[in-house]
Amino acid sequence: MARNSGFPCAGTVASHGRNIHGASRTFVVNDREGRVYGYYAMAAGAVSYQAATRSVRRNMPDPVPVMVLARLAVDHRAQGIKLGAALLQDAVNRAVAVSQNAGVRALLVHALHDGAKQFYEHYGFQESPQHPMTLMLRLNTVRA
């Protein structure tokens, strides 16, 4: 179920309950006065072999372990300054760090609308063969 949750962003923010009992971690960009301009949340997860992209599922068990980008939002006042791209890069860097120490294959996101899907595709995410709004980025393709 999507809801605005009081955060003035360009789109809606999905509430999936992923932070119940510490199941996710949220990372926030704010100014000195505490005004939030953007945030994202990440959680551990898995994707079925059939729903994974070919490159993600290759030589992996079923289900395939992933990091889930549960939310990413930018305040409408911070639109146009590439804050979303910076937040995404930080999330990718954190997921890569996890993948170097644990068996995590990809970063997975559920895009809420076509604009969000295009944003993630621009940064190399690929569409799930079963769920067009589920996108994945194989982490070893972004390692330095």
Predicted regions span which residues?
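Non-catalytic substrate-recognition and accessory regions of acyl/acetyltransferase enzymes
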Residues: 1-81, 85-144
